[in-house]
Amino acid sequence: MVIIYSASWCAPCKYAKKLLDDKNINYKEIDIEKADINRQELQKLTGGLTVPQIIINNKCIGGFDNLLMLDQTGKLQELL
């Protein structure tokens, strides 16, 4: 299961969702503004303060750059 903590104004969030969409990987998006999650709560949930924060099978991998690196090295599929 993939979960993305995102915000509507966040460009890297859009890039992350596009990458997952292009690879036909299902994910659950949690908009931190709509869910009323502040940065401290986000850090407790994910370990990170910024969006996106991406969780794959209960492991937080970080943001878009980390997701892209995992994809480019072929390790993304291993985590799924």
Q: What would you call each of these model-derived segments?
A:
Residues 1-26:
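Local sequence-structure signature of Cys/Sec-based thiol-disulfide redox active-site neighborhoods
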Residues 7, 13, 48-51, 64:
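A short, glycine- and basic residue-enriched loop/turn
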Residues 11, 36-37, 62:
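Short alpha-helical
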Residues 26-39:
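Thiol-based oxidoreductase modules, predominantly thioredoxin-like and allied folds used
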Residues 39-45, 76:
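Short amphipathic alpha-helix with an adjacent loop that forms part of the alpha/beta core around
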Residues 43-50, 68:
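Thiol/disulfide oxidoreductase modules built on the thioredoxin-like
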Residues 56-80:
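Non-catalytic, surface beta->alpha helical segment in thiol-disulfide oxidoreductase systems
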